Amino acid sequence: MRNREDRARGGSVAFLALAACVAVVAGGARADDVAARSWANVVEDDRAIRIETEQLEAVIPKNSPKQWMTGIEKGTFLDKATGFREVGDGLMVIDWLMEPGSDEEWPDEILGQEGHGLHRYTWFANETDPARRDYALMAHGSSHRKRMVEGPQLCHRMKPVRPEVIRGDDYVAVKTTYQFEYAAPGRKAGSTWTQLIVFPRGERYFVLMDRIDSVNDVDELILRNDTPGCVRHERGDTFSEMYLSYLGGPNGVRIPSSEFFEPFPPDLKFGYRRDQNRTPEHFIRAYHLRDPKTGADGPWLAGLTLEPSVVYEAWASQRPGGIIVMIEEIHGKPTKAGESFGAAHVVGFFDDIPSMHKVYERYKGHTGLEVDASGWRLLK
């Protein structure tokens, strides 16, 4: 009897020990899972999605934005290491699908009212009022006319969206899609824009892709955006200099903020056109943040377009009203209905210019981005 009881007690002890080990392993796995996800916090409500990592904060609007829809919301992109934020109207905001050419012959009766529906591009030749003509020259210059292919201008007129939040062990991603709602004469509406934003663990930047799935045949189809974003300033109070890697030779050009004290059109200086400029090794646009209260320099905020050849045109022009517009247009190539094109970018905070180029070398040559259960990856 005693032997049976001893064996029973021994079996019970062994079972309990095994159960304890299983519990420890399971508990450890759960703890590891919690730890893996604790580096990033995602808060979503009816208006927006807020992402907070160990390095960054950012908000992606769903509706009722502080300034523009698409991309990262105005003033929300925070570098925790330095306390500096983006100082424009948001990051990587999207305009519309365009092509070179004139819209003067479009009949007035097909145009929308007060910015809603199809409208002509703001161009000096379309304007009779002197003030409007001057604004058009400052906004878009006079040398490379364009027109809308499909609208609306998403940053201004996009309806509320429901982005998808995707989480992995080493990333948080947000995916937004939208179909263009109206089109120019002879075109169809319905091309799809997709923006995928990935926040990798441990980085002071995000990786972003814009992709277009076209429903039209267009000889030079263009997607326009702001890369990384516009700059708001009063005589250089928020930034000390700008860096453009694609101008001024192989090392790029550093431009003091004083060059942006007075308005100038985009085709006067600091412009890039693929048909007129050498395609650079790296395509980087960055501004050096400055504390407006103390004048002390902070980090650089940079946008890296990872395949330079996709850039069709880019400018950094000072408009009236204290804003530098950082337009970047991609693709500008023959596109058939059913075809797709896109660009991939890295946008974030950097301590210096060499660190931008180091990250560029790590990711260069890519135009696409995808995520799944195994992680995130750039695509060529």
For the regions a protein language model found, what residue spans apply to each?
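Polysaccharide-binding surfaces and accessory modules of carbohydrate-active proteins
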Residues: D33, V207, D217-G298
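Acidic-aromatic substrate-binding/catalytic surfaces of carbohydrate-active enzymes
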Residues: D46-E181
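Bacterial N-terminal signal peptides
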Residues: A14-V25
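N-terminal secretory signal peptides that target proteins for export/translocation
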Residues: M1-G10
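Beta-strand-rich recognition/accessory modules
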Residues: D45, E52, P263-K380
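Broad, structure-driven detector of short, well-ordered beta-strand segments within folded domains
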Residues: Q55-K62, T82, G190-V198, G298-L306
